[in-house]
Regions:
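Non-heme di-metal
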Residues: 1-152
Length: 152
């Protein structure tokens, strides 16, 4: 898939992460945990904005990316899993601890995906974009570990 289309799918993925964090913040009873989940939701929105900047760059410099085609299999799988997670939260099929563990696992997967994408780009701006996304995912994962310890 072209870089622009791949980044568009990645935007949808980050939006789904944000929606899940927001939903989790609404159902947890602990205010500190809720506030942290809201912050994570907003940080996912920041990831969306980074990806939008990447799309704008790719559109203005298409010749830099004409030979790069990236699979969206992992992204599409992540989108489906996040949609399922949000539905499970809405239906109360899982509790907050289970939800945190599920989203934690997805953060690990996409930290790795973002690291792998760095190697696919020679262009420094795109490398920086995926480095920022990977660091954000790592930070989210670390904070989720702390949140699990805060809950009973």
């Amino acid at each position: 898939m072209s870089v622009v289309l791949t980044l568009s799918r990645a935007i949808l993925l980050e939006e789904k992460f944000s929606e899940c964090y927001q939903k989790m913040s609404e159902i947890v009873f602990d205010k500190y945990v809720s506030d942290q989940l809201k912050t994570l939701s907003q940080e996912e929105v920041s990831h969306v904005n980074l990806l939008k900047a990447g799309i704008n760059f790719a559109k203005h410099e298409p010749n830099l990316f004409e030979d790069i085609h990236i699979s969206t299999i992992e992204i599409d799988r992540g989108i489906k899993l996040l949609i399922g997670l949000k539905e499970s939260l809405e239906n109360k099929d899982i509790d907050i601890i289970q939800a945190i563990h599920k989203i934690y696992d997805l953060e690990i997967i996409f930290e790795e995906v973002h690291l792998n994408k760095i190697a696919e780009f020679e262009e420094p701006s795109m490398k920086q974009l995926f480095e920022a996304l990977s660091k954000g995912d790592r930070s989210h994962r670390e904070r989720l570990e702390t949140l699990v310890d805060k809950l009973p």
